[in-house]
Amino acid sequence: MPVTSAQVKMARAALDWTVRDLAEATGLHRNTINNIEVGRYAGDPKTLEIIEQKLKAAGVEFIEQNGGGPGVRLRKPTKQKR
């Protein structure tokens, strides 16, 4: 299931990223990111996949709709072995 506009905005906020940060990470224009987040543009599947993959690589986990609505959370950092 593709990410939703709300999930993109929540994920960006969880990472404390600006629209510019996400645009630079994905190679997309800031206006594209903004238009997706405010619902003016649903985003084509390839664009949403690029956004999802970059956010996942940064530590975001996407939560499917399970009665409470779709959401995001940050992965717990893994402990380094000494």
Language-model region placement:
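Recognition helix of helix-turn-helix/homeodomain-like DNA-binding domains
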Residues: 27-43
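Helix-turn-helix/homeodomain-like alpha-helical modules used for DNA recognition
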Residues: 60-82
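Short basic helix-loop element that most often maps to the first helix and adjoining turn
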Residues: 6-21, 77, 81
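A charge-rich, low-complexity, intrinsically flexible signal that marks solvent-exposed coils, linkers
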Residues: 10, 25, 41-43, 63
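DNA major-groove recognition helix of helix-turn-helix/homeodomain DNA-binding modules
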Residues: 27, 46-63
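A detector for short, charged/polar N-terminal pre-domain segments
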Residues: 1-3
